[in-house]
Design a protein with these regions (language model features):
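Catalytic phosphate/metal-binding cores of nucleic-acid and nucleotide-processing enzymes, i.e., regions
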Residues: 1-133
Length: 133
């Protein structure tokens, strides 16, 4: 009898955890849509998408979404690295109550993104300089 009670509590926590995860993912989707990105939550538990991302819609970015008060960021980053495809940057989008969303990613991925940003800014500067001649 005690076993059934413990099993029921564990199952309840598991379902509650999935519901909280879904809620956080939907919240992140709404936030990304505010920025103009057509993002959506994946059905990662159905097994029919073939995707491990929690949220899709940002090309080349693997999104691991965590909406928790206490986050083990090292474990979350390792999960993102493990689940991301070779052509995607592993990222963890995370938020606590009454705080802004944050994005954490490995430094080498950030450097690659920054190099692309820097190159595009320099190209725009050259184009603007050429137009003003």
């Amino acid at each position: 009898m005690e076993y059934l009670k413990i099993f029921s509590e564990v199952k309840s926590r598991s379902i509650n955890s999935k519901q909280k995860g879904k809620k956080g993912e939907l919240e992140l989707v709404r936030k990304l849509k505010e920025y103009g990105y057509n993002c959506r939550r994946t059905n990662q538990f159905c097994g029919n998408t073939g995707q491990a991302d929690d949220v899709i819609g940002l090309d080349y970015i693997h999104i691991e979404c965590k909406r928790v008060e206490k986050l083990n960021i090292d474990e979350a980053i390792e999960q993102a690295k493990r689940d991301s495809k070779d052509d995607k940057f592993p990222t963890v989008f995370h938020r606590k109550n009454r705080k802004d969303w944050l994005v954490t990613m490995p430094l080498d991925s950030w450097i690659k993104l920054y190099n692309e940003y820097y190159s595009s800014m320099k190209l725009a500067e050259r184009e603007n300089a050429d137009e003003s001649k």
